[in-house]
Amino acid sequence: MARNKPLGKKLRLAAAFKXNRNPPVWVVVKTKRRVTRSPARRHWRRVKLKA
């Protein structure tokens, strides 16, 4: 990927980066481990973004 990115692409990549994480610990505790993983997790090599 180019070092110099357009601002729109940079913002979309940043939003995807933020969304790609586990749920917070307090959610796991509050649901008594019923919710332990996020269905929207994405691996950088397996699933590519349309950004």
UniProtKB/Swiss-Prot annotation:
One of its GO terms (cellular component) is cytosolic large ribosomal subunit. GO terms for molecular function: structural constituent of ribosome. The keyword Ribosomal protein applies. It holds the Pfam family Ribosomal_L39. One of its GO terms (biological process) is translation. This is Large ribosomal subunit protein eL39. It comes from the Archaea. Belongs to the eukaryotic ribosomal protein eL39 family. Keywords: Ribonucleoprotein, Ribosomal protein.
